[in-house]
């Protein structure tokens, strides 16, 4: 077998979903049926091999993405099991960036939940082909057909149903295979390892033919031969039909839908077949785009072992046995241990020591990795998440990842002098691992401020600091990470002039400040022509604006969603310098504050609340009291689903209040939606602080 033919038998996939939809349970069954492990690890028992952190075992949730490799039907499947909790969405983001395909797991009762929408959009962003697995079909209230409708309505996707469930809720025993038009029934005694094929149940023949017709209509459009056979009324061979589906999945025309119950050991083997049959190999996806460092020209990187080595570092973590581990996805070429590669972002070299295949937190040393592989490198010194590693004679940079801004912060103080130094080391290490985690020191109080994606995120970080680094710390109450922005365009001319005994300082800048749409961040542009300001001084202007916008205008919060355009200025042959222009930019920013309509922004959370009917009035009243607005209400079995938008500042401790008003029967989930202007009374209190 040629090496690139071997590449066609590789699948890099992620398992993604809302929390508690059954991602890790599904992954554990995959590992059992592929022979990767000889027992099934259950999440609720804290025994899932993919949830290896102590915090994951205790909470029964996935916190960090875990990688593993297994084999099925002569194909190698590299799997990344990702978290479903919104606080750890960064793990999903960086995993999807390096994957070729994904399995989206849905709760057969709840269907498409808020975090399902989030991860789906993340997969859309990176054009990741997907398969849907409707899980928990054995649960009371499970409804396969409603879940399929929700995929259309909430995700805007085109589902291609390949299976139908046989039996409802506790009577769910197997599936109808619409490709082969047969039933598949699982044997309970073998933990689902054994199953048998049979006839389609008589009461399902009509609906099976209906969905088979829909399947054929969608799939045959991808192949002329298949279309001709279909319109001539002839049977389309299963192999040709599978090729049509594969092409449609790779082109994101539709999303195959399968069903089962991972916990009851039903439906996992056909899911593995679908991964092999329909999700792309590394050499099926479009060529990766990069930038040639020397020429700044775009380059296309072909996924082949015979090309130059190019890889993306997508995760850095600390292992107590081997130190720093850098996870990479190799897009082209080969990598051997005891060689040297280039970090094209840092323009520095890295020596490759150990190359490791990972199974959760277990390691296997290998001497070589090649295109398509996902491996970990031990002991890299300078590489961080998003950096490109490449051959020394092929300096290219791949597109960097974008990470969300933290929305919550806490003050962290060491309990003793001995903890002081250890805390600095611990936090530096944790921040380097997690791009969604931020740290700074309050210049007035001297307190260390830790910024994260939510209460659980920060709670886990503090817990890791204590367990892994033996640091005891006092933790302040969570605070909202507000932002500031401008609402008007304004032109500012500012002259910085200072004369001391020796050389003076002189810089003149003319800057246009403009508001940008939400989510745009900060943008800087120079329109200097004719040498009004020498090129070497312009970065000083940008640096000055970057530095001062972090200190805010109203209440000391970072300023976002605005553009600064440097369109004119002046310099002095002797007295001008990059520092002078940096100070001039800061002065222009300060002058702009009172003229550009500065406002304070607060994070708004999209909240989904599931409550029994009898508590709906209390729940809605409580939402309104939190400055929230109800956007939508739906019926789901015997419960009401309320979709609301509520300021994060009003969500602290909400879980306790919700349990209290519903006698513990209601539940909720939330994720960041957008920033909105805060009411004047909140603005006044924040300015006082």
Swiss-Prot record:
Q: Does the keyword Protein biosynthesis apply?
A: yes
Q: What CDD domains does this protein's entry cite?
A: EF-G (cd01886), EFG_III (cd16262), EFG_mtEFG1_IV (cd01434), EFG_mtEFG_C (cd03713), EFG_mtEFG_II (cd04088)
Residues covered by the tr-type G domain:
8-283
Biological process terms from the Gene Ontology for this record are:
ribosome disassembly
Question: InterPro entries under this entry?
Answer: EF-G-like_DII, EFG_II, EFG_III, EFG_III/V, EFG_IV, EFG_V, EFG_V-like, G_TR_CS
Q: Where in the cell is it found?
A: Cytoplasm
Q: Tell me one GO molecular function of this protein.
A: GTP binding
Question: Which SUPFAM superfamilies did the record assign?
Answer: EF-G C-terminal domain-like, P-loop containing nucleoside triphosphate hydrolases, Ribosomal protein S5 domain 2-like, Translation proteins
Alphabetized UniProt keyword annotations = Cytoplasm, Elongation factor, GTP-binding, Nucleotide-binding, Protein biosynthesis
Q: Which Gene3D superfamilies match?
A: 3.30.230.10, 3.30.70.240, Elongation Factor G (Translational Gtpase), domain 3 (3.30.70.870), P-loop containing nucleotide triphosphate hydrolases (3.40.50.300), Translation factors (2.40.30.10)
Sorted alphabetically, which SMART domains does this protein's record hold? Answer: EFG_C, EFG_IV
Residues that, per the record, bind GTP: 17-24, 81-85, 135-138
The answer, when asked if Protein biosynthesis is one of the entry's keywords, is: yes
Which is one Gene Ontology cellular component term of this protein?
cytoplasm
Q: What does this protein do?
A: Catalyzes the GTP-dependent ribosomal translocation step during translation elongation. During this step, the ribosome changes from the pre-translocational (PRE) to the post-translocational (POST) state as the newly formed A-site-bound peptidyl-tRNA and P-site-bound deacylated tRNA move to the P and E sites, respectively. Catalyzes the coordinated movement of the two tRNA molecules, the mRNA and conformational changes in the ribosome.
Spell out the family assignment given in the record's similarity comment. Answer: Belongs to the TRAFAC class translation factor GTPase superfamily. Classic translation factor GTPase family. EF-G/EF-2 subfamily.
User: Would you tell me the protein name for this molecule?
Assistant: Elongation factor G
The organism is Ehrlichia ruminantium (strain Gardel)
């Amino acid at each position: 077998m040629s090496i690139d033919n071997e590449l066609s038998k590789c699948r890099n996939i992620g398992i993604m979903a809302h929390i508690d939809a059954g991602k890790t349970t599904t992954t554990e069954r995959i590992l059992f049926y592929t022979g990767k492990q000889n027992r099934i690890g259950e999440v609720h028992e804290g025994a899932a091999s993919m949830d290896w952190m102590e915090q994951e075992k205790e909470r029964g949730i996935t916190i960090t993405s875990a990688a593993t490799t297994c084999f099925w039907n002569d194909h190698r499947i590299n799997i990344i099991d990702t978290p479903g909790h919104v606080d750890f969405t960064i793990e999903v983001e960086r995993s999807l960036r390096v994957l070729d395909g994904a399995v989206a797991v849905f709760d057969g009762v709840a269907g498409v939940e808020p975090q399902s929408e989030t991860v789906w959009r993340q997969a859309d962003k990176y054009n990741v082909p997907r398969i849907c697995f409707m899980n928990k079909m054995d649960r009371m209230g499970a409804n396969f057909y409603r879940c399929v409708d929700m995929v259309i309505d909430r995700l805007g996707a085109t589902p291609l149903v390949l299976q139908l469930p046989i039996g409802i809720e506790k009577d769910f025993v197997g599936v109808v295979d619409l490709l082969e038009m047969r039933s598949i029934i699982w044997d309970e005694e073998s933990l689902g390892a054994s199953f048998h094929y049979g006839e389609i149940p008589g009461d399902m023949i009509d609906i099976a033919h209906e969905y088979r017709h829909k399947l054929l209509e969608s799939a045959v459009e991808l192949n002329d031969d298949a279309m001709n056979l279909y319109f001539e009324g002839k049977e389309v061979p299963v192999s040709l039909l599978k090729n049509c589906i594969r092409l449609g999945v790779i082109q994101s025309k539709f999303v195959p839908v399968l069903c089962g119950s991972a916990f009851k050991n039903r439906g996992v083997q056909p899911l593995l077949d679908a991964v092999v049959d329909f999700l792309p190999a590394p050499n099926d996806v479009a060529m990766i785009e990069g930038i040639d460092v020397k020429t700044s020209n775009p380059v296309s990187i072909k996924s082949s072992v015979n090309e130059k080595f190019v890889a993306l570092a997508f995760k850095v973590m600390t292992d107590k046995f081997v130190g720093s581990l850098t996870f990479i996805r190799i897009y082209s070429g080969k990598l051997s241990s005891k060689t040297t590669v280039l970090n094209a972002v840092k323009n520095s070299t890295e020596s490759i020591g150990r190359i490791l295949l990972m199974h959760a937190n277990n390691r296997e040393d290998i001497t070589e990795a090649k295109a398509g592989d996902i491996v970990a490198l031990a002991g890299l010194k300078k590489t961080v998440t998003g950096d490109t590693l490449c051959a020394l004679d092929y300096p290219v940079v791949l597109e960097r990842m974008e990470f969300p801004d933290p929305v919550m912060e806490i003050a962290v103080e060491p309990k003793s002098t001995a903890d002081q130094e250890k805390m600095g080391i611990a936090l530096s290490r944790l921040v380097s691992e997690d791009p969604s985690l931020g740290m700074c020191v309050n210049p007035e109080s001297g307190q260390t401020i830790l910024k994260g994606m939510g209460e659980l995120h920060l709670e886990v970080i503090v817990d890791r600091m204590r367990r892994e680094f033996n640091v005891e710390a006092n933790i302040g109450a969570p605070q909202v990470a507000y932002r500031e922005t401008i609402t008007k365009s304004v032109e500012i001319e500012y002259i910085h002039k200072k004369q001391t005994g020796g050389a003076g300082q002189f810089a003149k800048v003319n800057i246009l400040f403009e508001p940008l749409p939400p989510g745009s961040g900060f943008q800087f542009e120079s329109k200097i022509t004719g040498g009004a300001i020498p090129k070497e001084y312009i970065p000083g202007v940008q640096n000055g604006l970057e530095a001062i916008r972090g200190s805010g205008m109203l209440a000391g919060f970072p300023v976002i969603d605005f553009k600064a355009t440097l369109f004119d200025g002046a310099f002095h042959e002797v007295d001008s310098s990059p520092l002078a222009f940096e100070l001039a930019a800061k002065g222009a920013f300060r002058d702009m504050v009172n003229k550009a309509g500065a406002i304070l922004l607060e994070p708004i959370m999209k909240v989904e609340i599931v409550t029994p009917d009898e508590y709906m009035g209390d729940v809605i009243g409580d939402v309104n009291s939190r400055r929230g607005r109800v956007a939508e209400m739906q019926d789901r079995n015997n419960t009401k689903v309320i979709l609301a938008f509520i300021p994060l500042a009003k969500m602290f401790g909400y879980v306790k209040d919700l349990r209290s008003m519903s006698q513990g029967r209601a539940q909720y989930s939330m994720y960041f939606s957008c920033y909105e202007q805060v009411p004047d009374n909140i603005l006044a209190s924040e300015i006082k602080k």
